[in-house]
Amino acid sequence: MFPRIRSLTLVFILALFVTTVSLSLSQAAKPEAPGLAAWDQVYSVLISPRCINCHTATNYPQQGDDRHRHFANVVRGPDGHGVPALNCVGCHQDRNAESTGVPGGLNWHLAPLSMQWQDLNDQPLSSAAVCRAVTDPSKNEHMNGPALLKHHETADLVLWAWNPGRRPDGTMRTTPPLSHQEFVAATRAWVEAGTPCPKGR
């Protein structure tokens, strides 16, 4: 009888241990889940044409919702501002030029190659890869979570994505899939969750 009681006791203790570990792991995962859901929303904006066209992996910017190469063979240049004969601000002024359809914003330039969000075939990088780049201080100009939130909330070229003006044909450019307010809220939720990134390549 006693051996049976000991066996039952061991089974009970083992079951209790497994349950406790499972609950602990579940509770540990819960805070990350909302953060990852928030990141999914952030990612949907970052890979929209208004953002990814200037976060290229190539030596040139892109244009349009189809993300074709910038006309006139405009190139990145040494600092992302073009080259002397085709400097970005030569055409892109501080605001949209509604009469010509040329978009504009303060300090118009390409994002650095360290912040590329697409591959050399012009395809968006995975959510995990973009998240790693966005959260890597060596690539993102040394921004931590709060600095990223401020950047998304106030940077002129980020704000431009929701006020992109008209195309040369007079039609309105598309905006990201979230409103700016929703984008900032998603970024804040992601930052408050500790900027978790999806697993994978």
Question: What do these predicted ranges mean?
Answer:
Residues 1-43, 63, 76-79, 96-201:
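N-terminal export/targeting leaders of redox proteins
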Residues 34-35, 70-71, 91:
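Short amphipathic alpha-helical surface micro-motifs
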